[in-house]
Amino acid sequence: MDESVDPVELLLRLLIRHKPHLKPYAYRQDSWQRVLDEYNRQTGSRYRQSRTLKTKFRRLKDLFSADRAQFSPSQLKLMGALLDEAPEHPRPRTKFGNESSSSLSSSSFIKSHPGPDPFQQLSSAEHPNNHSSDDEHSGSQPLPLDSITIGIPPTLHTIPMILSKDNDVGKVIKSPKINKGTNRFSETVLPPQMAAEQSWSDSNMELEICLDYLHNELEVIKKRQEDFECKVLNKLNIIEALLSQMRPPSQGDKI
């Protein structure tokens, strides 16, 4: 491995160059593979799966949000450029997301411009079933191709985090449509069996990453051991040659 190469800065530069996190689903894996090959070539690593670099990038984003003092100025600049290109929480492009954004904008407009009849708004709030058909229709819309993850629902990473905050649900989710959609999703899409399968899948993924990391470390240690043995043998050969030159001639040589 070249000591002058900063692995973090190299990874960020490769992500800016190839942009695998911004590519459509059909081209994303190939782009990540190019990043992996270039990263292994310049750092001397032997990572076999691009998932390892994805995990590194996710942890860098978490560390960037928690403590930016851990980054150098050049790393901060590259990380800021990456986050500007790809927001951490992009707005969904489904019909449900459009309806929720429009409902939020309309609610802010109503707060700044109150209508003449508040009783009509109160009656509409007491009967939320009028929009149930809209919610069901929006839930049947297909998701965009680049947000589909094989075997795991695309919102699986966000919904458990929201549902785990029992006291802050009302603060995090303000729209009644989002509340109803989240409850319906948790009742139908995340039964206990699927939650157990998700936990097993996450554990298996972490295990594969750890095994890949250990394999790479063992390969590096093996290479260092071979280099060390080669250097020792070369030095022994030099010492043997010097000793043979310093050895006095025998009686047979004098005769």
Swiss-Prot record:
Region (Disordered): 87-149
Compositional bias of kind Basic and acidic residues: 128-138
Alphabetical keyword list: Activator, Transcription, Transcription regulation
Taxonomy, superkingdom: Eukaryota
Signal peptide: none
CC annotations in GO: nucleus
An MF annotation (GO) of this entry: sequence-specific DNA binding
GO biological process: allantoin catabolic process; positive regulation of transcription by RNA polymerase II
Job of this protein: Positive regulator of allophanate-induced genes in S.cerevisiae.
Protein known as: Protein DAL82
Naturally occurring in which organism (per UniProt): Saccharomyces cerevisiae (strain ATCC 204508 / S288c) (Baker's yeast)
Lineage: Eukaryota, Fungi, Dikarya, Ascomycota, Saccharomycotina
